UniProtKB/Swiss-Prot annotation:
Fe cation binds at residues 328, 330, 374. InterPro entries: EF-hand-dom_pair (IPR011992), EF_Hand_1_Ca_BS (IPR018247), EF_hand_dom (IPR002048), Oxoglu/Fe-dep_dioxygenase_dom (IPR005123), P4HA-like (IPR045054), Pro_4_hyd_alph (IPR006620), Pro_4_hyd_alph_FE2OG_OXY (IPR044862). This is Transmembrane prolyl 4-hydroxylase. It comes from Homo sapiens. Keywords: Calcium, Dioxygenase, Disease variant, Endoplasmic reticulum, Epilepsy, Glycoprotein, Intellectual disability, Iron, Membrane, Metal-binding, Oxidoreductase, Repeat, Signal-anchor, Transmembrane, Transmembrane helix, Vitamin C. Induction: By hypoxia in many cultured cell lines. Its main location: endoplasmic reticulum. The gene is P4HTM.
Length: 502
């Protein structure tokens, strides 16, 4: 079993409990189960998706979009899209509109979600016919689990071999081709941007306020030192105190900032992530072991086959010595201004923002790492979450090269072990709600040897209707396209620009 090193006060680890296969089943009603006291014992291993407890700040999202350089569309077109897509609930669409409509939108049932019970809780499940597996709860915030021996050593070696045969490319997060146009159409004033960054409302931008919101630029990990170097290069901080007043910020030309970021050539150690990756298809026509692993994930999650099978292909990642991935979340918040990468085929292309919508992450460790390479969850099981608290004095908990040992929970890589967690909070109606801030995680610095992992991301659109339309369209392509238009082709197109949100 992979060791999980924990710092800070954590719930007491319970003794291992063997039980029959858990009752994974869709929930009926959150309030009814709460009244009955379910979710506190062995008889209720599955809970319905309930009211979200956290909020992903819209202000943070807006600032993040500025500095991650995502494409910004025309606001008027956006409003028209939202109006005509969702309609006006207070008005009658009229008989002609109803007659010409496509009919009732397809709907999907509630999503299942494994109950954590308590940290250290174990349960026995049978995912394959010849052996049992044990699921251990590692944290409740985020809801995080570990399964030793999910993959055999032979399966791990096969995945690595297939990835090497296909070829790996350098992993990086870079600006989109529409970056210059995005900046020219930005409708946010300098004053509004200053107010969004000024978290403590003191009229000055401290370094940690800027760092908390501008996590990367051109794939370059921002540090206090790099921020001050940038200030000096673009003459944004005349007095050199590292603090920007409103006047100093107003005098700064944001185009100079982006020119500087674009021209900076960062070393590997300065990047947001330092790794190589490739994608392996798991559907019809793939290696039988790859298909078997996807079926095992399907049995583990108890989600519908359509959701699991139409999710992203398996991502295989190699971290060499010195490799790392600074702390991030796997999913981005979804507002009316955004679409999910996987359902954009059925969404209106005029929506300006695109993000990854990953309901679950299932991560496999494919080898034993000689030194370092842990997966860190910096704020796991914290009582509260505050973006600004991630940076205190000279410690940035998101920095996995320097401060992995400060994180609340670290999982040591062990060949064949899987860890999985939920990236979204429940919405109270059986679907996904806000992004779970506690799912913040990263890959610690590999100090010796090489680290191999694989990610199975389970994609769900927060819009239940859009997810249903996506599944319907993929089914139509499979029926009508024959061998030339199978879901593999559709998925390759849908995930051509797949990214991890920071």
């Amino acid at each position: 079993m992979a060791a999980a090193a924990v710092t800070g006060q954590r719930p007491e680890t319970a003794a291992a409990e063997e039980a029959s296969r858990p009752q994974w089943a869709p929930p009926d009603h959150c309030q009814a189960q709460a009244a009955a006291g379910l979710g506190d014992g062995e008889d209720a291993p599955v809970r319905p998706l309930c009211k979200p407890r956290g909020i992903c700040s819209r202000a943070y999202f807006l600032v993040l979009m500025v500095f991650v350089h995502l494409y910004l569309g025309n606001v008027l077109a956006l409003l028209l899209f939202v109006h005509y897509s969702n309609g006006d609930e207070s008005s009658d669409p009229g008989p002609q509109h109803r007659a010409q409509g496509p009919g009732p939108e397809p709907t999907l049932g509630p999503l299942t979600r494994l109950e954590g019970i308590k940290v250290g809780h174990e349960r026995k499940v049978q995912l394959v016919t010849d052996r049992d597996h044990f699921i251990r709860t590692l944290s409740l915030k985020p809801l995080l689990f570990e399964i030793p021996g999910f993959l055999t050593d032979e399966e791990c070696r096969l995945i690595i071999h297939l990835a090497q045969m296909k070829g790996l490319q350098r992993s990086q997060i870079l600006p989109t081709e529409e970056y210059e146009e995005a900046m020219s159409t930005m409708q946010v004033s300098q004053l509004d941007l200053f107010r969004l960054l000024d978290q403590n409302r003191d009229g000055h931008l401290q370094l940690r306020e800027v760092l908390a919101q501008t996590r990367l630029g051109n794939g370059w990990w921002m540090t206090p030192e790099s921020i001050q170097e940038m200030y000096a290069a673009i003459k944004a901080d005349p007095d050199g105190d590292g603090v920007l007043s409103l006047q100093e910020f107003s005098n700064m030309d944001l185009r100079d900032f982006h020119k500087y970021m674009r021209s900076h050539k960062a070393e590997s150690s300065e990047l947001v992530r330092n790794s190589h990756h490739t994608w392996l298809y798991q559907g019809e026509g793939a290696h039988h072991i790859m298909r078997a692993i996807r079926q095992r994930v399907l049995r583990l999650t108890r989600l519908s086959p359509e959701i699991v099978e139409l999710s992203e292909p398996l991502q295989v990642v190699r971290y060499g010595e010195g490799g790392h991935y600074h702390a991030h979340v796997d999913s981005g918040p979804v507002y009316p201004e955004t679409i999910c990468s996987h359902t954009k085929l059925v969404a209106n292309e005029s929506v300006p923002f695109e993000t990854s919508c990953r309901y679950m992450t299932v991560l496999f460790y494919l080898n034993n790492v000689t030194g370092g390479g842990e997966t860190v969850f910096p704020v796991a099981d914290n009582r509260t979450y505050d973006e600004m608290s991630l940076i205190q004095d000279d410690v940035d908990l998101r920095d996995t090269r320097r401060h992995c040992d400060k994180g609340n929970l670290r999982v040591k890589p062990q060949q064949g072990t899987a860890v999985f967690w939920y990236n979204y909070l429940p919405d109270g109606q059986g679907w996904v709600g806000d992004v779970d801030d506690y799912s913040l995680h990263g890959g610690c610095l590999v100090t010796r040897g090489t680290k191999w992992i694989a990610n199975n991301w389970i994609n769900v659109d927060p819009s239940r209707a859009r997810q249903a339309l996506f599944q319907q369209e993929m089914a139509r392509l499979a029926r009508e396209g024959g061998t030339d238009s199978q879901p593999e082709w559709a998925l390759d197109r849908a995930y051509r620009d797949a990214r991890v949100e920071l």
